[in-house]
């Protein structure tokens, strides 16, 4: 059995080596000619899987080690009776880590208390729902907009997008890209809505790049300059708008979910799905794939202000500023598109908050609820 697999998918040998022969290729360079003798195709979000790619291939299974499926022509796979699996939720915790690191960074830079702000979450799926839980556990006021869920579950607990924009200091987008239909998200934040954002609003997009009108956002930032933006996803990746990149507070190259844990979880989920299709044993448990973290423990011996303690622990595991700086460096060296892709392809090892155990001594034990709410393991005494 021949498997064509994105070269940047981790633990490929451990998960798929026993299934067949692996043929590794850069995700953006996978072509139809590479699949002429392939039985399975394993990709990430940068590979467009459609009729043009698969038409003359014997591929019987496609797996994407990502939450989203925008890059997959699902109708064509169904037409050809090609098995398919994605990895919903595999990196959701990592994206929430990214959001918290970003919010703590911007709030420190601008001098406002995050825990006293109202945060709006647009899209309460795998990521948004986890972000909601962590923020509420921290005591942050949260508003949630998710029209499809509101239709299914009832309006209680949800608000409209316009209400969310009116009531929130921070707006986090975690919507998939839906181009048509009653709940389309393409340019969900269009020019009108961007112009309606209150001065001082922080807008963070870790959902879909096309969910925001980039030109309108650039105009608002370059003109009034009275809002702040954090962007991890962009229109026209990897050739993103250099002008917009220069205006946002934090610019990162679509890496919000790029924790080692999330990547391994995605690979493992696709391995499980392929094994099921082949009627083979499911293989090793996920826990055996995860190595021990380089930093496993941290000790706080005295109490700190809560947000200061959060920043200390968050940055011990993941500091979003490093990704922002790395993108700036690589763009200067290689240009926009190559620099963007280089950051993704050579992304440094990153773990999730849950891999760090924080030991609290003396009066630092008062920090236990907040640190646990943020996602860390906590031990007192």
Language model features with spans:
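Phosphate/diphosphate ligand-binding glycine-rich loop within oxidoreductases
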Residues: 39-112
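Glycine-rich adenosine-cofactor-binding loop
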Residues: 7, 88, 96, 115-136
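Oxidoreductase and adenylate-handling cofactor-binding alpha/beta cores
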Residues: 96-112, 137-140, 267-276
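Short, well-ordered coil/turn residues at beta-beta hairpins
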Residues: 6, 43-44, 65, 172-175, ...
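NAD(P)-binding Rossmann-fold cofactor-contacting core
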Residues: 10, 137-154
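Rossmann-like adenosine-cofactor binding region
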Residues: 49, 150-242
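N-terminal glycine-/charge-rich "phosphate-binding" loop or analogous flexible N-terminal tail
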Residues: 1-38
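Rossmann-like dinucleotide-binding domain for NAD(H)/NADP(H)
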Residues: 200-369, 374-381
